[in-house]
Structures are given as C-alpha cells and as structure tokens.
C-alpha cells in the first residue's frame, strides 16, 4: 500500500487509513482522554504519513512508525494542555471481562474497575504510555523502544516501575480484598 500511495494512488492511501485508523485512534484516546483531541491526532498522524510517505521504509512494518507518530503527537497535546493520561476503559474492560454471575460480583467488579482506573491515572506519563503500549496495544519491549525512541532498558525500567507502582497502589487500596489485590501481583 505504501508503494502504491507513493505513486499517487489515493485508494491505496484510503485503504491504509482504514486499516490502521482504529489502532491509532484508540492509542491516542487512551493517552489524551479527549475524543476530539484523539480524532485530531488521528488526522494529524495520517497527514504525516501522506507528507512523509517517501521517507517511510516500505520493507519495515508501518505500525511501529504509526505508533511513534501517534505517541509523539499525543505527548505534545498532553504537554501543551498540561493534562494527564487517563481513561483506559479498554484496559479496564480487558481486565474484567468475566461474565457477572451475581449482584455482589457486579459490585466487586465495579470497585475493581474504579480502583484500577485510579491507580493507572496516578502513574507518571512515561509509565502510563509504556503500560498502554505493552498491555493495550500488545507491543514488545523492542517495538515500544522504537516507538518511543528510547533504549530497551528504559522501556523495561518504565514497565517494571509502572507495574510495581500499580501493584503497590492496588495492594494499598482498602476497597479491594486481599484475594483480588493479589491477582495483580
């Protein structure tokens, strides 16, 4: 698709956009917590694809490059607005997808969702981005390092400290039972 887009094939660019727009949008939304901003970032990302199409190495997968652009645009938006990462409802939904069998279980799951969301919100920006890319987007450490343009050791460190901070916050949350909290360790 990249080669065809380079040749001016608009349908190829449209196919490229349709293939990756959901992933780019979800990542931007998880970082910026604002639907309008996520939509703007999505558009800006694909404008960059179109304007830099000649610089993109078509022998490499496009998605890590797209995520790098998405994360950078999202980071710039957050920095300009002095906002923190937040929603991550997708992560929380993935963590609590078991069917509810009782009202008590439903209440416990709602409490767990709130506790996880608050714990994730309290992490610093760098740890949150790494956790989003690792758990929500399923990228490897090497891919995250490429996307963020940092050494793999930095990604491992942020992932380690992000998990540790998340675990500490969840274990210290009085709303969670010990049994539920230990599931996060």
Predicted regions and their residues:
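Short amphipathic helical patch at the helix-1/turn junction of helix-turn-helix
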Residues: 17-18, 29, 134-136, 160
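C-terminal flanking helix
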Residues: 21, 25, 46, 124, ...
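Structural recognition of an alpha-helix C-terminal capping motif at a helix-to-coil junction
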Residues: 26, 40-47, 60-72
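Short, charged helix-capping/linker segments at alpha-helix termini
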Residues: 4-15, 25-44, 55, 152, ...
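Helix-turn-helix DNA-binding module
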Residues: 36, 117-154, 168
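C-terminal edge and immediately downstream basic/flexible tail or linker adjoining helix-turn-helix-like DNA-binding
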Residues: 4, 86, 90, 115-118, ...
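Arg/Lys-rich amphipathic alpha helix in sigma70-family domain 2
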Residues: 51-58, 68-89, 101, 109, ...
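Internal acidic/polar
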Residues: 84-113, 140, 183-185
């Amino acid at each position: 698709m990249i080669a065809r887009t380079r040749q001016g094939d608009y349908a190829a660019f449209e196919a490229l956009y349709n293939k990756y727009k959901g992933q780019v949008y979800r990542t931007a939304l998880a970082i910026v917590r604002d639907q309008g901003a996520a939509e703007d970032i999505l558009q800006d990302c694909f404008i960059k694809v179109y304007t830099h199409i000649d610089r993109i190495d078509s022998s490499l997968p496009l998605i890590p490059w797209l995520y790098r652009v998405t994360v950078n645009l999202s980071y710039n938006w957050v920095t300009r607005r002095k906002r923190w990462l937040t929603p991550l409802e997708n992560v929380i939904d993935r963590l609590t997808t078991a069917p509810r069998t009782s009202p008590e279980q439903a209440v416990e799951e709602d409490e767990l969702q709130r506790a996880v969301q608050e714990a994730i919100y309290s992490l610093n920006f760098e740890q949150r981005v790494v956790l989003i890319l690792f758990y929500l987007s399923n990228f490897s450490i090497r891919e995250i390092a490429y996307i963020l343009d940092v050494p793999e050791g930095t990604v491992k460190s942020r992932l380690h400290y992000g998990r540790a901070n998340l675990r500490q916050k969840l274990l210290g949350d009085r709303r969670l039972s010990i049994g539920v909290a230990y599931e996060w360790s």
